[in-house]
């Protein structure tokens, strides 16, 4: 018997669903693969019977309840996608909340958000002007002193500082745009390596700031002169 890959997948799904039916008949509560297979197979069989997409999805939602599955399964299987062949062609059926009765935040292993992190208040505010013809973005933990050379701001005031924005975010400066931004000191060991190469070591080492300003001036950075 020659089968297409789609037909082989259908037989695999049917086999898993039959196993789920047999275990359910023995009084066992289904796990995630078993529940998923049974729900998906119900859609495919409804399509084979000539039922429409909405009817197939409704049948899949009715096949299992919270008491038919192991604890936590309803919170894991929140959506099942399966491609089934209907009378008018192949359709992707999306069965949302197929089991119902999920415990939400009370489910075993649920991920709960921690307390909201409050960013520190800015200790320095500088006016930044983007003189470039393209937008410039600076990420939260970039040493702001070493930001794009075409950004015009008080570099000396920004030495050892980063943008006072949430971690992982960035601040964007449009072409010709002037924006006042708050800065906070770089934390931790205060060692800057990489970035634009203006600093390569401890930020607070003797002479480090003066050397960084000299390098910035030599490389044509705007805003090197303290205003």
From Swiss-Prot:
<keyword id="KW-0963">Cytoplasm</keyword>
<dbReference type="InterPro" id="IPR002026">
    <property type="entry name" value="Urease_gamma/gamma-beta_su"/>
</dbReference>
<dbReference type="InterPro" id="IPR050069">
    <property type="entry name" value="Urease_subunit"/>
</dbReference>
<dbReference type="GO" id="GO:0009039">
    <property type="term" value="F:urease activity"/>
</dbReference>
<dbReference type="InterPro" id="IPR036463">
    <property type="entry name" value="Urease_gamma_sf"/>
</dbReference>
<comment type="similarity">
    <text>In the C-terminal section; belongs to the urease beta subunit family.</text>
</comment>
<dbReference type="InterPro" id="IPR008223">
    <property type="entry name" value="Urease_gamma-beta_su"/>
</dbReference>
<feature type="region of interest" description="Urease beta">
    <location>
        <begin position="102"/>
        <end position="227"/>
    </location>
</feature>
<protein>
    <recommendedName>
        <fullName>Urease subunit gamma/beta</fullName>
        <ecNumber>3.5.1.5</ecNumber>
    </recommendedName>
</protein>
<dbReference type="InterPro" id="IPR002019">
    <property type="entry name" value="Urease_beta-like"/>
</dbReference>
<dbReference type="Pfam" id="PF00699">
    <property type="entry name" value="Urease_beta"/>
</dbReference>
<dbReference type="GO" id="GO:0043419">
    <property type="term" value="P:urea catabolic process"/>
</dbReference>
<keyword id="KW-0378">Hydrolase</keyword>
<dbReference type="InterPro" id="IPR036461">
    <property type="entry name" value="Urease_betasu_sf"/>
</dbReference>
<dbReference type="Pfam" id="PF00547">
    <property type="entry name" value="Urease_gamma"/>
</dbReference>
<feature type="region of interest" description="Urease gamma">
    <location>
        <begin position="1"/>
        <end position="101"/>
    </location>
</feature>
<comment type="pathway">
    <text>Nitrogen metabolism; urea degradation; CO(2) and NH(3) from urea (urease route): step 1/1.</text>
</comment>
<dbReference type="GO" id="GO:0016151">
    <property type="term" value="F:nickel cation binding"/>
</dbReference>
<comment type="subunit">
    <text>Heterohexamer of 3 UreC (alpha) and 3 UreAB (gamma/beta) subunits.</text>
</comment>
<comment type="similarity">
    <text>In the N-terminal section; belongs to the urease gamma subunit family.</text>
</comment>
<dbReference type="GO" id="GO:0035550">
    <property type="term" value="C:urease complex"/>
</dbReference>
